[in-house]
């Protein structure tokens, strides 16, 4: 492919509105362009990478018997009313009307559509299982699109749906998808973890998320690639190294999710779902009587603890939530933080939100800062974190402004439902007892769910079982954020390329180091002087030879300065660069491996053989 024929609008500078490196490089390297807020055009390079990823997906899904189809993106609202999601999905749902004033939506997901198709076509358990998927643009009216392709209003997604006559059959397909996802993300060159996830708006029960890890850019050996002009990091002056470190740190670490994972086992979970090892403790101290004490101007746990000279771990944090229009009191040990996802899941609530100051005062008789679990109205629902039951003689709000109560003892002074509703902390023991929890940032690139009968129940999707009884179809759901993959790969494979000029100056610039499986082309073939006919002829021969051996070749045939060509090549990030330069008449070309910065000169006749050796090594 001739570069002069492609739309690759590279920029000389990083875009000023980009906060994460993947967004900046996709724009600067000419992969994408924003059409409007949260809506992007995928230019030829990005489209080629996405198509390569689609090929990987299709190959792996064929192995597990998944069949591709295509459903409409424009959906009637009636289907979503059947499932109940039209009213509950929220403001992110694009709603529109046609000329007949009928309600439609632009699909963010397609559970209802696939359920309807199968409901109308499948009548017997003998027709199951079915394993269907599509690759399609989805739509979500994001309030604040940001970070390039990571949070957009239109995005490309692979969504798959499986249909079964029982849960045992679903378990088999769910495991098939889990293994297929691992194979897909491994082939794509991603550093990822499969973690325990939350079903969220999808309505799933069991679920697993696949997160591309986005580590901090502190390891110079990982993030910096040295040109052959620099032997090692030790040769770079200290002041230049500090500049490089500052440049690495200047870009925000992307990843809207925090992952908690064990240092010694396979345990990993989204922070929203992560738990830790818990061991109940027996009370050894005698229970004191309740004593009301004045705590003037103390509104926070740390202020109360300091005023009463107690540790924060001896205090009870009392919060009020409204769950599906019903008040729920949540209790935590004072130095812990509430995990609202855990609480919402435990309550099986559709809506959960913190109560207002006015609602709290109406319920407790006091404002924030003085709330507590003692002497609440009969029938009040109290959900306490499991650690609370280990407390003896704790401090809690007295439900009276400016007062607290000491000597509070769970069981004696209040009754509660005990469950894990706290946010875990880094360094705590893993729940499996092996290793401690560490945190990392991550980008969600895939998610699989066991939907069960969530949609078949609400939409009447039934089959006749072995005994001729009508039973609901059991479903699974499997998604991959296709356009997000491009961002995730660049976040992990962006590199700062450093070289030394003949004058001894050090230069550094960002570029992409694409893994070969997803690179838009395999080889960047550059002619230094397009007016040199010998070089042109050699370039044409090498291009033909490479293509005959199965290489995708991008040939830079532009009449541009060589410095501009090399700069664009570093930005675009193809794995191999072959330069036809001043030694073309001698039949000598230069090979440069992008991942390492290594370069060698070879006879053009030996190019293919040399590339085969080098690509095996790297």
Swiss-Prot record:
Pfam families: HGTP_anticodon (PF03129), tRNA-synt_2b (PF00587), tRNA_edit (PF04073). It is an enzyme of class 6 (ligase). It is found in: Cytoplasm. One of its GO terms (cellular component) is cytosol. Its EC number is 6.1.1.15. GO terms for biological process: prolyl-tRNA aminoacylation. Transmembrane segments: none annotated. Keywords: Aminoacyl-tRNA synthetase, ATP-binding, Cytoplasm, Ligase, Nucleotide-binding, Protein biosynthesis. PROSITE patterns: AA_TRNA_LIGASE_II (PS50862). InterPro entries: aa-tRNA-synt_IIb, aa-tRNA-synth_II, aa-tRNA-synth_II/BPL/LPL, Anticodon-bd, Anticodon-bd_dom_sf, Pro-tRNA-ligase_IIa, Pro-tRNA-synth_IIa_bac-type, Pro-tRNA-Synthase_IIa_type1. It comes from the Bacteria. It catalyses: tRNA(Pro) + L-proline + ATP = L-prolyl-tRNA(Pro) + AMP + diphosphate. One of its GO terms (molecular function) is proline-tRNA ligase activity. HAMAP family: Pro_tRNA_synth_type1 (MF_01569). Catalyzes the attachment of proline to tRNA(Pro) in a two-step reaction: proline is first activated by ATP to form Pro-AMP and then transferred to the acceptor end of tRNA(Pro). As ProRS can inadvertently accommodate and process non-cognate amino acids such as alanine and cysteine, to avoid such errors it has two additional distinct editing activities against alanine. One activity is designated as 'pretransfer' editing and involves the tRNA(Pro)-independent hydrolysis of activated Ala-AMP. Homodimer. Belongs to the class-II aminoacyl-tRNA synthetase family. ProS type 1 subfamily. Consists of three domains: the N-terminal catalytic domain, the editing domain and the C-terminal anticodon-binding domain. This is Proline--tRNA ligase. The lineage of its organism: Bacteria, Bacillati, Bacillota, Bacilli, Lactobacillales.
């Amino acid at each position: 492919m001739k570069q002069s024929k492609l739309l690759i609008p590279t920029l000389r500078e990083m875009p000023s509105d980009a906060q994460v490196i993947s967004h900046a490089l996709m724009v600067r390297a000419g992969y994408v362009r924003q059409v409007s807020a949260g809506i992007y055009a995928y230019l030829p390079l990005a489209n080629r990478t996405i198509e390569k990823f689609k090929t990987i997906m299709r190959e792996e899904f064929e192995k597990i018997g998944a069949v591709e189809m295509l459903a409409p993106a424009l959906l009637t609202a009636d289907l979503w009313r059947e499932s109940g999601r039209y009213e509950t999905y929220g403001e992110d749902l694009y709603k529109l009307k046609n000329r007949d004033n009928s309600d439609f939506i632009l699909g963010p997901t397609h559970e209802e559509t696939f359920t309807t198709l199968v409901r109308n076509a499948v009548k017997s358990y003998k027709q199951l299982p079915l394993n269907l998927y599509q690759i399609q643009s989805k739509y979500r009216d994001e309030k604040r699109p940001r970070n390039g392709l990571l949070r957009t209003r239109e995005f490309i997604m692979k969504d798959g749906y499986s249909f079964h006559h029982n849960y045992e059959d679903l378990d088999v397909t769910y495991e098939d998808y889990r293994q297929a996802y691992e194979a897909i993300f491994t082939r794509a060159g991603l550093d990822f973890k499969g973690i325990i996830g939350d079903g969220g708006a999808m309505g799933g029960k069991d679920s697993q998320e696949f997160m591309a890890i986005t580590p901090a850019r502190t390891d110079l050996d990982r993030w910096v690639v040295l040109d052959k002009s620099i032997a090692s990091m030790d040769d770079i002056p200290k002041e230049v190294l500090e500049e490089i470190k500052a440049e690495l740190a200047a870009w925000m670490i992307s990843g809207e999710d925090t992952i908690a994972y064990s240092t010694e086992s396979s345990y990993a979970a989204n922070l929203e779902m992560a738990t830790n090892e818990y061991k109940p403790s027996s009370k050894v101290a005698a229970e004191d009587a309740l004593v009301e004490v004045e705590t003037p101007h103390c509104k926070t746990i740390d202020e109360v603890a300091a005023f009463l000279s107690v540790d924060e771990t001896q205090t009870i944090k009392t919060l009020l939530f409204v769950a599906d229009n019903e008040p729920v009191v949540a209790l935590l040990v004072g130095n812990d933080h509430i995990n609202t996802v855990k609480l919402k899941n435990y309550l099986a609530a559709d809506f959960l939100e913190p109560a207002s100051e006015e609602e709290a005062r109406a319920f407790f008789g006091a404002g924030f800062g003085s709330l507590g679990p003692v002497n609440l109205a009969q029938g009040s629902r109290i959900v306490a974190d499991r650690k609370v039951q280990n407390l003896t003689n704790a401090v809690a709000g007295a439900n009276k402004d400016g007062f607290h109560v000491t000597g509070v003892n769970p069981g004696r002074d209040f009754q509660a439902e005990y469950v894990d509703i706290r946010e875990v902390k880094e360094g705590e023991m893993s729940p499996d007892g092996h290793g401690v929890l560490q945190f990392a940032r991550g980008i969600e690139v895939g998610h699989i769910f066991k939907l069960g009968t969530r949609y078949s129940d609400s939409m009447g999707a039934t089959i006749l079982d072995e005994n001729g009884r009508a039973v609901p179809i059991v479903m699974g759901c499997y998604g991959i954020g296709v356009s997000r993959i491009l961002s995730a790969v660049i976040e992990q494979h962006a590199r700062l390329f450093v070289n030394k000029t003949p004058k001894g100056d050090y230069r550094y610039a960002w570029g992409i180091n694409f893994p070969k499986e997803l690179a838009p082309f395999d080889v960047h073939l550059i002619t230094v002087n397009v007016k040199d006919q010998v070089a042109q002829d050699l370039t044409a021969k090498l291009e033909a030879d490479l293509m005959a051996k199965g290489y995708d070749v991008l040939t830079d045939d532009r009449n541009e300065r060589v410095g501009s060509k090399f700069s664009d090549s570093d930005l675009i990030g193809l794995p191999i660069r072959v330069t036809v330069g001043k030694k073309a008449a001698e039949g000598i070309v230069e090979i440069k491996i992008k991942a390492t910065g290594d370069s060698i000169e070879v006879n053009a006749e030996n190019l293919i053989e040399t590339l085969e050796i080098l690509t095996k090594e790297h």
